[in-house]
Each structure stands twice: as C-alpha cells, then as structure tokens.
C-alpha cells in the first residue's frame, strides 16, 4: 500500500471514491432525493477540487498497485470551536475506504498519517463526527483514543441524523 498526497487533479478520483463509499455504507438509509442532494453538495468533482486546492486542506490517497483503497481529508482550521476547551482543534473531515477493503490496514494507515500531520501543524486536538449508529467506526476511533465530546446534527439532504462529535487530545 502506498499513501500519496492528493491534488486538485485527483478530484474525480476522490469524489468517486467518496460517493461510492458513502453509498455502499449508508445509501440504503436515505431517499433518492436526499442522497442525491448530499452527494452533489459533498462529493461532486468541483466541490472536491476546490477542497483539494484549499491550502488548509490536507488529503492523502491510499493505493495498492495504482488502485485506490481510500482517502483521508484533514482540515487545518478550528473545528467545532463551540465544543471543548482545545486551543487548536482541527477536523478529520473524511476517512473513507473502498467497499471490501476493511481489515486491510487502509484505515489505520490513513489515521496514522492524519494524526502525525495534526501533530506536525501544532494542533492540540483532532475532532471528527461519526453517525450515532455506526458502531464499527466508533470502535475504530476509540482504539486511537477518541472520546465522545458532544451530540451534533448531520444533514443528508433534508434528513437529520444524530451524530457524535469525537475528540482526541494530542500530547
């Protein structure tokens, strides 16, 4: 497995991987209209290209023999400042792995990169949101020391989901 930096030229790849991963994991939970609205707002190539061009965004793509396995986006701006006491909490925006790649170490490699990057920019905390019923992801984050910080809302189209805000304090 190889991790490489993403650039705006990777927007279509990251957008497709994001769309496909979200649909595989959660698509069955939403109406077609809500899902389409969410995907257009979050996983359209133009949206992703703008994110990847943002100097405050860091993104790594995991590949195996050129085949994409996953990606991780880290936003180097304060995340959810209304919660917690961290001085500089940044957001782990997305950590998505392709369907069928669970257990291959992709998520762990991307998380290790994200935490090293966060420490490298002087963050004292990393925050992320996770669906309240996604116990698999919650267990993954707990293994790294993330803890529940707050309950927040997450919108997929017009559907509100209960989401947990997790935080990892960095030493």
Residues of each region from the PLM?
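Extreme N-terminal starter segment of soluble prokaryotic enzymes
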Residues: 1-2
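Acetyl-CoA-dependent GNAT
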Residues: 5-11, 16-30, 36-100, 108-113, ...
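Alpha-helical segments flanking ligand/cofactor-binding loops in enzyme cores
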Residues: 12, 138-139
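Conserved catalytic-core motifs of GNAT/GCN5-like acyltransferases
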Residues: 79-80, 127-130, 142, 147-164
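Active-site acidic-Proline motif in GNAT/NAT acetyltransferases
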Residues: 98-100, 104, 132-133
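Short glycine-rich hinge loops at helix-strand junctions in the catalytic core
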Residues: 105, 122, 145
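Conserved short alpha-helix immediately C-terminal to the canonical SAM/SAH-binding motif I
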Residues: 110, 134-137
